[in-house]
Amino acid sequence: MSRSGRSKSKYLNINIDDVHPETGNYIADCGGDMERGVFKYLLKLIEEFPKIKVTLFVTPNWIDKPNDPILIKLIKKVLGLKYTNEWKDEPFRLDKHIEWCEWLNELVRRGNVEVAIHGLYHHRNSDPHSAEFLGLSYEECITRLLNAERIFETSGLKYVRGFRPPGWGVSEGLFKALKDLNYVFVSLDPLACEINVPRYEVSEFNSLINIPQNWDIKNGKIEEAFEILKKGNILSVKGHIQERYGRDKLNNGLTEESYKNVRKLLIRIEDEGLDLRFAKMEEIANDFRGEKR
């Protein structure tokens, strides 16, 4: 069940999916190239607008690979072969990239950034291949979440108890597992997840605080952002770390174009003198719980 409560504050949060240590030497720079790669656009925004707050959704053991061309995929299906692709030998497991984790920790220590959990593998063995938790049982969800946390702990990467489901794949077992493991917030898209939660409001969902996404980092229009703030209490600026991943085009990655779009939004907000609180998702969730007491 979802329960909305109009918060006294209006918030702005920037949130980025699919962050993991993969570099441009593989399929795409997914954050692994650090300040030399796509992260430079986020760092430029933080330098220009030091009040902004960012939630990075990190996958601790990314094994997902893009789909094959349709014909090859169909042939694999007909032959009864595994038709989803994955990385072997877990090359992007966080505890294999301690230097990268420490670099992210430094961003966390500065106060603008938090790290939340974005699945364990970001992969499943059937379509849709990125919807990792789709249809999983409670026990399977508990196991994956605990394994994800274990990798975060061994890597030393600091994280908060927040979760966004990879590929928007969810199940009742997932929500019960998140509740029982004392997660603070979840971030769901009501349309993609087919779940009845508000798109423009922070709300309570299954004893978790849901913080939606509602404005595209690259394609969002400025007037649309102001309409969202009129309708609700949060402008949640959503993007991916990568613009495309092999054949999979995401079209809202960290690029020069998305940097310019968000910069234009932030300048307009300053010019209008809007009374917004820039906050990380954990801060928003804690505020919401405090106001409900």
State where each predicted segment sits.
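Acidic/His metal-coordination segments adjacent to aromatic residues that form catalytic metal sites
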Residues: N214-I217
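Active-site clefts of carbohydrate-active enzymes
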Residues: L208-N210, K238-D248
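Catalytic alpha-helical scaffold of carbohydrate-active enzymes acting on polysaccharides/glycoconjugates
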Residues: M1-G162, W168-S207, N219-V237, N251-R293
